[in-house]
């Protein structure tokens, strides 16, 4: 019989007395009331509720005692934190099993047999990380440091969970010839594959830059189907995979499969630390075959999902209607994530992003758009401006506050003497603009950028104060279009139709609420600006 981990010690994520107004506290991005958080786990939409589980340390703001925290929402914006779903076994004494990253499904056909009295079981598949050698109730012997794949189930909509101790782990070791990789075998992403009527799970052999694809009839017994990799970027370990299906916009009859994959370290050019890449291809229920255009020679390039430093461990929702795909990522970076100056919590999640495939500049590309429920916290303080020409230099704007949504567009141009070399909006700026975060466009290199070199506190890491950039072409209307989400300690930028994004944390002073436009070396033409203030999702 398993254990009801959610009730252990009565641990609640929500702490009394915290009102989500601490310095740097995100107002419309999820963060736990207190303690350490990293990867999103077990993203599941079921019975009208979005479940967000996450890697969580119940003991403090450092990584450790890995458990699954739990929050729910009806709109992906307003979140309620629940008791810990899967508490590190043995905590607060000697921990014998930690619950590393994984995913969750609603087993609507009760293939697992866990459902009783007509209740649909929710089944989580996760990596059991064992710090000590031990013999398990299932009769399996564990080596210290081993990582294996296990399952747990819930019959009360995710409030309490029972681990499947009779047989866990259900995938004990990596298959031959990879047995030696038992310490780097993790992060199962599980989903129902309708065409073959089977469950599919994708795990990583992290150090070998390989994915293993498994299939099952019942979530309990798994067979190896195929493997994938190494391809493209292999600068660090491969982690946190997803395998998702998306139609190509404009031709609904063409559906492709996409692998989204974390890499740590070895993120996008110009960043240090972790990042997220993707592959587009086909999946037949057994094998993923990447499209030739999705593979680069020499492991020197990749299809980056986000070109900023703070987008990692992107996870996909199971159970969404209409084939929708929404992902949430950890808005942090292993380079400095344990040092960021927040208290009593550490780390936040990205805004939820709706994924699609579109043909951009002749290539099928993964496109991200912010899930539109952010509008539920937009306030009525809207600033709208348009200029035929913004003069060289600085144009001060009314203060948009500490949290806002910005839509900025302007005409592209080639380098001319009278026209700007770069154009940017400065946000979270001090009154003298010595502290500011710049989001803008370089007309010479045709790149969008986020410049956090003067964004605020960067004392905790020598690599933090950096300018990040990536290519962005003008749209068919010859305009550059930017969507910018500003929160108390982050900016997320979506360029064009969403074919590029850059996500970056910032830690400005409390009173840094000013904004301005900066047109360098000349004028910028046909500028349109809309700024919506954002209310707190917590009040």
How would you describe each model-predicted region?
Residues 239-241:
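Repeated scaffold domains used in trafficking and secretory/extracellular systems
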Residues 15-187, 192-236, 247-307, 329-387, ...:
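Beta-rich carbohydrate-recognition and catalytic domains
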Residues 4, 32-35, 316:
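Short acidic/polar alpha-helix capping motifs at helix-coil junctions
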Residues 1-17:
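Cleavable N-terminal signal peptides of Sec/SRP-targeted secreted and luminal proteins
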């Amino acid at each position: 019989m398993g254990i009801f981990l959610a009730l252990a010690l009565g641990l609640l994520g929500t702490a009394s007395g915290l009102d989500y107004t601490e310095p740097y506290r995100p107002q419309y991005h999820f963060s736990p009331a207190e303690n350490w958080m990293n990867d999103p786990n077990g993203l599941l939409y079921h019975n009208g509720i979005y479940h967000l589980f996450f890697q969580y340390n119940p003991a403090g703001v450092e990584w450790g005692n890995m458990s699954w925290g739990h929050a729910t929402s009806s709109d992906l914006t307003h979140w309620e934190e629940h008791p810990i779903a899967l508490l590190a076994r043995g905590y607060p004494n000697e921990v014998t099993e930690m619950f590393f990253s994984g995913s969750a499904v609603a087993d609507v056909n009760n293939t697992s047999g866990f459902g009783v009295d007509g209740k649909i079981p929710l089944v989580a598949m996760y990596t059991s990380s064992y710090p000590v050698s031990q013999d398990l109730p299932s009769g399996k012997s564990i080596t210290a440091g081993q990582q294996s794949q296990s399952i747990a189930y819930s019959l009360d909509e995710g409030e309490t969970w029972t681990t499947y101790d009779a047989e866990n782990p259900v995938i004990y070791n990596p298959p031959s010839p990879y047995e030696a990789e038992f310490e780097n075998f993790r992060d199962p992403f599980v989903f129902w594959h309708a065409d073959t009527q089977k469950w599919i799970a994708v795990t990583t052999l992290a150090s070998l830059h390989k994915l293993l694809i498994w299939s099952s009839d019942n979530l309990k017994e798994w067979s190896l189907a195929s493997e994938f990799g190494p391809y493209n970027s292999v600068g660090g370990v491969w982690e946190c995979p997803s395998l998702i299906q998306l139609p190509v916009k404009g031709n609904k009859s063409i559906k492709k499969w996409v692998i989204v994959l974390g890499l740590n370290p070895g993120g996008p050019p110009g960043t240090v630390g972790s990042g997220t890449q993707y592959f587009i291809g086909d999946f037949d229920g057994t094998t993923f075959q990447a499209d030739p255009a999705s593979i680069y020679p020499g492991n020197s390039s990749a299809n980056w999902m986000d070109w900023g430093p703070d987008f990692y461990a992107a996870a996909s929702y199971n159970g969404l209607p209409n084939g929708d795909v929404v992902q949430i990522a950890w808005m942090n970076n292993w380079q400095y994530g344990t040092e960021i100056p927040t208290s009593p919590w550490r780390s936040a999640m990205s805004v939820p992003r709706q994924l699609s495939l579109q043909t951009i500049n002749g290539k099928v590309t993964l496109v991200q758009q912010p899930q539109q429920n952010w509008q539920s916290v937009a306030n009525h303080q809207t600033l709208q401006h348009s200029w035929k020409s913004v003069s060289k230099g600085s144009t001060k704007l009314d203060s948009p506050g500490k949290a806002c949504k910005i839509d900025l567009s302007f005409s592209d141009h080639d380098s001319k003497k009278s026209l700007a070399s770069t154009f940017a909006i400065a946000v979270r700026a001090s009154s003298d603009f010595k502290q500011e975060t710049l989001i803008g466009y370089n007309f010479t290199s045709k790149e969008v950028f986020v410049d956090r070199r003067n964004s605020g506190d960067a004392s905790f890491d020598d690599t933090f104060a950096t300018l990040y950039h990536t290519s962005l072409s003008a749209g068919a209307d010859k305009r550059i279009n930017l969507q910018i989400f500003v929160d108390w300690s982050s900016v997320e930028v979506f360029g064009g139709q969403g074919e590029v994004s850059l996500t970056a944390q910032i830690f400005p002073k409390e009173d840094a609420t000013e904004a301005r436009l900066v047109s360098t070396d000349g004028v910028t033409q046909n500028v349109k600006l809309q700024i919506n203030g954002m209310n707190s999702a917590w009040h």
